[in-house]
Amino acid sequence: MDQIVIRGGQRLKGRIPISGAKNAALTLLPCALLTDEPLTLRNLPRLADVDGFGHLLNQLGCSTTIEGSRPEDFGRVMTARATTLTSTVAPYDIVRKMRASILVLGPLLARAGEATVSLPGGCAIGNRPIDLHLKALEAFGAEIELASGYVKAVAAGGRLAGGRFTFPVVSVGATENAVMAAVLAKGTCVLENAAREPEIVDLCNCLVAMGAHIEGIGTETLTIEGVDRLHGATYRVMADRIEAGSYACAAVITEGDVELVGAKASEMEATLAALREAGATVEETKGGIRVAMAGRAQPVTLSTAPYPGFATDMQAQFMAMATLGTGASLFTETIFENRYMHVPELARMGCDIQVKGRTAVVRGVDRLIGAPVMATDLRASMSLIIAGLAAEGTTEVNRVYHLDRGYERLEEKLQAVGADIERISAG
């Protein structure tokens, strides 16, 4: 099994290209199931989850071709075409590896009138049920059955009727599934208290490019007027705001100066506000965002919240950044339970972190010491990388397959801005 070895203490300085967003790509790929014409996605990141989703599309009868598959290529281009769906079943052996696989449920139901999808896997960061996905689809006319670890959904007459659904709590995945299901409904579908993440805006814009009728994009109320068919399109995947924020935290903890090329400030305002709270210089550039730090980070008080609040996917990285800060930082995790699994691993490096329920207090220490650590999930693994970049000595990060699910060519990007980091392959 691969590991990443970091010899810390190097100040990061230079330009880091930000890849296409993993969370957007995994939402845009299932759009190919909604039409029999080609959907071409540009700026697609080279990630294990993206490759896995492509395999799932193949299983359902969707052909895929990829340009830019050489190791040195950034921003791959995938063309997917589902001329005829050969299956409406997403099997356990694929879905168990990747939670985002549940996002084929809505498109299959919309296109074929039925779908059978295994209950999902993915990161082990607590209980993430799909009940809101199913309730939204039921509100649009679907009949849902759960049996033997699978969800079976059927649209009476082969097509959803339409309807109105109010999310009792904001859910990104459920909003995405419901929007994709609604675009081919017979009537109008209204989603209230919908998630507003930039990735959902990206999804809606792609669907509109394919001929969908969606009003209220970027707001909490989405009105989707169903159409008879969608056509193909060419669409560029948005930049990854979580990747950009992760490298920003790395710049701060190493007292560095980096430009995040391709990042958009308008899509990550809460992250940038938190960086400024920590004392970083943050400014927009012609090509992205510059983040620079002189001295140790100031204490921050952060509580995760649905967009436009502070993203739960940035919590672990900011916690790592705060470990060498000047005082005590307070973190409250409101989205997922059990999302502090990185804390024991950070403690191995000398971090002072106390967790009580959903709250964590991070007291800055004068130094971190490199140690062997183990990644537990995608964002937790990045927090270990960030801490390792600033630690004295050598840090060995194990189970890096978690990183490969969400960070494209991480070692190469960090090496280019001065980090002493390498991947050691097993065997």
Curated annotation (Swiss-Prot):
Reaction equations catalysed: phosphoenolpyruvate + UDP-N-acetyl-alpha-D-glucosamine = UDP-N-acetyl-3-O-(1-carboxyvinyl)-alpha-D-glucosamine + phosphate
**Gene Ontology terms describing biological process:** cell division; cell wall organization; peptidoglycan biosynthetic process; regulation of cell shape; UDP-N-acetylgalactosamine biosynthetic process
Provide a GO CC annotation, any one. Answer: cytoplasm
Q: Which Gene3D superfamilies match?
A: Enolpyruvate transferase domain
Pfam family example for this protein?
Answer: EPSP_synthase
EC number(s) for this protein?
2.5.1.7
Q: Name one GO molecular function term.
A: UDP-N-acetylglucosamine 1-carboxyvinyltransferase activity
Q: Which residues carry this modification: 2-(S-cysteinyl)pyruvic acid O-phosphothioketal?
A: 123
Which residue positions are annotated as catalytic? 123
Q: Which CDD domains match?
A: UdpNAET
EC class of the enzyme, as a word: transferase
Q: What are the transmembrane regions?
A: none
Read off the PANTHER family from this record: UDP-N-ACETYLGLUCOSAMINE 1-CARBOXYVINYLTRANSFERASE
Extract the NCBIfam families matched here: murA, PRK09369.1
By sequence similarity, the record places it as follows: Belongs to the EPSP synthase family. MurA subfamily.
Write down what this protein is called.
UDP-N-acetylglucosamine 1-carboxyvinyltransferase
